[in-house]
Amino acid sequence: MILTTTPNIEGKPVLEYLGIVTGEAIMGANIVRDFFAAVTDIVGGRSGAYEQKLSHARQIALNEMAEEARRLGANAVVGIDIDYEVVRDGMLMVTASGTAVKI
């Protein structure tokens, strides 16, 4: 399965557009991790705990989207957009969407 943010794949014409596909992941926050992330932010540096959480949520959303595309008979997803949003109570939502295609 080819996944790309571009609207097409160079050298590979789209044979069929199969529709919009999406994937979502909602991850909860951890109070202890939040505390240490805040300390990291105060003293400078990167928050590894949050980076791991974001990476994991993004991968879940992309995997769900790719699986939906496979069910439609696609072998690629083009025009992928990934969005991040904090929802109530510190929950993090990551969504991935794109167009399932046959190339």
Swiss-Prot record:
Q: Which Pfam families match?
A: YbjQ_1
InterPro entries attached to this UniProt entry: UPF0145_dom_sf, UPF0145_YbjQ-like
Query: What family classification does the UniProt entry report for this protein?
Result: Belongs to the UPF0145 family.
> Which PANTHER family does the UniProt record give?
UPF0145 PROTEIN YBJQ
Q: By what name is this protein known?
A: UPF0145 protein PTH_2690
